[in-house]
């Protein structure tokens, strides 16, 4: 069940503010980001290394829909590498997800989950589904 409480919108708004300060920002969904990394790792190691370096050093990395990807052992390792390299480089990161912390521990390794719990501030979005509210509003107006 996918609900929309504005996580993507808020993440993008934060990214816009960081860009205005002259910093670099990269936004991508977890499924696209991880599948591209996996593709490069197999087909073009130079591109893989360039992308890994970029993900380690961009001022703000925003990963949306975390947990929506088809999670494999290789992808779990990539997530851990991204988090570790960003922590080492003291770079900020936003992860948005519909998963609970329990889900993250179940789906990912304890190492990934413990880094997220230990290194990130968690915010829970509650309320009405924004997409449903907008659809209802449009039906009433139209």
Regions found by a protein language model. Name each.
Residues 1-26:
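Walker A/P-loop
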Residues 22-24, 57-61, 89-95:
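Loop/turn-to-beta-strand initiation segments
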């Amino acid at each position: 069940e996918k609900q929309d409480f504005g996580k993507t919108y808020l993440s993008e708004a934060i990214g816009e503010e960081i860009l205005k300060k002259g910093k670099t920002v990269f936004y991508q969904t977890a499924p696209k980001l991880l599948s591209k990394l996996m593709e490069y790792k197999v087909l073009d190691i130079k591109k893989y290394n360039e992308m890994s370096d970029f993900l380690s050093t961009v001022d703000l990395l925003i990963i949306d829909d975390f947990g929506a990807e088809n999670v494999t052992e290789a992808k779990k390792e990539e997530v851990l590498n991204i988090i570790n390299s960003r922590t080492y480089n003291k770079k900020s990161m936003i992860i948005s997800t519909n998963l609970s912390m329990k889900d993250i521990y179940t789906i990912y390794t304890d190492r990934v989950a413990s880094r997220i719990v230990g290194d990130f501030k968690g915010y829970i979005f509650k309320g009405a589904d924004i997409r449903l509210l907008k659809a209802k509003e449009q039906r009433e107006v139209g």
